[in-house]
Amino acid sequence: MTWQFPDRLSTNSALPGPAFSGQPAVDLSSFADFLRRQAPELLPAALGGAQSGPASSSGGTGQLPHGTTIVALKYPGGVVLAGDRRSTQGNMIAGRDVKKVYITDDYTATGIAGTAAIAVEFARLYAVELEHYEKLEGVPLTFAGKVNRLAIMVRGNLAAAMQGLVALPLLAGYDIDARDPEGAGRIVSFDAAGGWNLEEEGYQSVGSGSIFAKSSMKKLYSQVVDADSAVRVAIEALYDAADDDSATGGPDLVRGIYPTAVTIGAEGALEVPESRIAELAREVIQSRSRADTFGPDAAGGDK
């Protein structure tokens, strides 16, 4: 589908803003650019909308809710993206059931870490951006195009990031144009300036507990043989991160709150059922309960 009236944007009286100034029409294939030119107040503040509240003042960012740890692993024929559920506000727990993993189109998903408000808007706006492009152009973006679109959005947040409002996504997807379907899983990490890196090791993590999660995945990655084993390793990595990072939440058996995960393969992006995640989480906890029993509480340790 293509825009039938190439000159309509700059003359349509129903579209307020710079259209009346005689400026050239915006790139219609980019929804974010369209909003930036026509209705910037609808954009997140960091991406060109009106600045308000803590985003416009330094020193007020410490009490904003922050998302924490996201992990991604490749498996033969796809990739898994998973995240914990905790958000923190300073030294307080702001939320225990926060959703941090979002399916953005048929073959990609993003995980969010950093300032929660900005990160969630990234995920939602990015999903609209991909859908908007496909509706106008009639074809989906290539995976490289999807990476570049997200990098532009991250770069647009640089000014806010320098004030402490950092939000970093982790992009996972399946490249339908890859020559080898078994190796078509893709993981892309970003820095605050919009630079990106295509992971070749097979796993990546972002967030406050990422160093612990990556160490765990490094040791367990040899166990990944399919989607189910990849989900288990992802849950185990989040468990390890929660064990050492207070900002990362592990499986909460009492409240019934577990990590969320998405698998992406040739069949598309699919959310892993909560029942399966709960089952794997219990298996991990049970195995760790046996393996980690040492010290004064170990068998034979009583005097």
From Swiss-Prot:
Component of the proteasome core, a large protease complex with broad specificity involved in protein degradation. Residues 1-67 form a propeptide. GO terms for molecular function: threonine-type endopeptidase activity. The gene is prcB. It catalyses: Cleavage of peptide bonds with very broad specificity. The keyword Protease applies. It comes from Mycobacterium avium (strain 104). Pfam families: Proteasome. Pathway: Protein degradation; proteasomal Pup-dependent pathway. CDD domains: proteasome_protease_HslV. It is an enzyme of class 3 (hydrolase). One of its GO terms (biological process) is proteasomal protein catabolic process. Belongs to the peptidase T1B family. Keywords: Autocatalytic cleavage, Cytoplasm, Hydrolase, Protease, Proteasome, Threonine protease, Zymogen. InterPro entries: Ntn_hydrolases_N (IPR029055), Proteasome_sua/b (IPR001353), Proteasome_suB-type (IPR023333), PSB_actinobac (IPR022483). Coiled coil: none annotated. One of its GO terms (cellular component) is cytoplasm. The 20S proteasome core is composed of 14 alpha and 14 beta subunits that assemble into four stacked heptameric rings, resulting in a barrel-shaped structure. The two inner rings, each composed of seven catalytic beta subunits, are sandwiched by two outer rings, each composed of seven alpha subunits. The catalytic chamber with the active sites is on the inside of the barrel. Has a gated structure, the ends of the cylinder being occluded by the N-termini of the alpha-subunits. Is capped by the proteasome-associated ATPase, ARC. Its EC number is 3.4.25.1. The active site is at T68. The formation of the proteasomal ATPase ARC-20S proteasome complex, likely via the docking of the C-termini of ARC into the intersubunit pockets in the alpha-rings, may trigger opening of the gate for substrate entry. Interconversion between the open-gate and close-gate conformations leads to a dynamic regulation of the 20S proteasome proteolysis activity. Signal peptide: none annotated. This is Proteasome subunit beta. It comes from the Bacteria. It is found in: Cytoplasm.
